[in-house]
Amino acid sequence: MVQRLTYRRRLSYRTTSNATKIVKTPGGRLVYQYIGKTGKVPRCGECGVNLAGIPALRPYQYKNLPKSRRTVSRAYGGSKCAKCVRNRIVRAFLIEEQKTAKIVFKKQQKDLKQKKDKKSSK
């Protein structure tokens, strides 16, 4: 005759949080063992691609990991992918370049105008 099994916890429905597998103990009994939920891989905040170098765990398991395993040692390490960080840095650089170019252009225009005024006054 087959041994009957009962859940060890109060939840009696077959939900994802109540997933079990049958295991035979050293004493020969069959018991339910609870399986934890599988974690999701963290994703990039901008483009949504999976972040490389960070394990897929449940949120409460990340607190037990050392910081070197939780993040990547780079700017925006655990939240943005390398491609998005590169784009952000390049964009910031180009914006700064544009600002300085604008200032230089204004100065050149001002100098040119002053030279014209000097020539016309003579």
From Swiss-Prot:
Keywords assigned by UniProt, alphabetized: Ribonucleoprotein, Ribosomal protein
Q: Which domain of life is it from?
A: Eukaryota
Q: Which GO terms describe its molecular function?
A: structural constituent of ribosome
User: What biological process terms from GO does the record include?
Assistant: ribosome biogenesis; translation
Q: Where does this protein have coiled-coil stretches? A: none
Keyword Ribosomal protein belongs to the record: yes
Among InterPro entries, the record links this protein to: Ribosomal_eL34 (IPR008195), Ribosomal_eL34_C_sf (IPR038562)
**Gene Ontology cellular component terms for the protein in this record:** cytosolic large ribosomal subunit
Q: Which Pfam families match?
A: Ribosomal_L34e
Identify the Gene3D superfamilies for this entry: 6.20.340.10, 6.20.370.70
Q: Does the keyword Cytoplasm feature in the UniProt annotation?
A: no
What PANTHER family does UniProt report for this protein, alphabetically? Answer: 60S RIBOSOMAL PROTEIN L34
- Family the UniProt entry places it in: Belongs to the eukaryotic ribosomal protein eL34 family.
Which protein, by its recorded name, is this?
A: Large ribosomal subunit protein eL34
Organism of origin: Dictyostelium discoideum
Gene, per the UniProt record: rpl34
